[in-house]
């Protein structure tokens, strides 16, 4: 196994998804992350990329701010990422005050 994330803590990273950009072979991972949490269950969304076949990984938090999910609303399966010709499109759900919202970002390597 190869470690993808940069986290040295014992916090949770979960519901990971990944894709390979067929145009250049770059690897792209997306997951929920609690490594920077200031309160219990505070969650961010992290994108990790490798442009050298998995020898090195670069990590970036892409959520605008952390959120704290509630046990009453399931949100985890609704996360995905696509990559085509250096254009990366992650999609995820976050919860704010018990309301789910769908988010995306426009990430470009070119």
Task: For the regions a language model picked out, list residue spans one by one.
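Extracellular, repeat-based ectodomains that mediate carbohydrate processing or recognition
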Residues: 1-110
């Amino acid at each position: 196994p190869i470690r993808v994330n940069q986290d040295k803590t014992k916090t949770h990273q979960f519901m990971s998804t990944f894709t390979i950009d067929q145009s250049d072979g770059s690897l792209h991972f997306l997951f929920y992350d609690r490594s920077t949490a200031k309160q219990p269950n505070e969650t961010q969304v992290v994108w990790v990329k490798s442009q050298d076949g998995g020898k090195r990984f670069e990590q970036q938090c892409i959520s605008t701010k952390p959120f704290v999910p509630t046990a009453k609303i399931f949100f985890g399966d609704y996360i995905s990422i696509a990559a085509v010709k250096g254009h990366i499109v992650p999609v995820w759900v976050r919860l704010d005050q018990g309301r789910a919202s769908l988010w995306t970002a426009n990430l470009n390597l070119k």
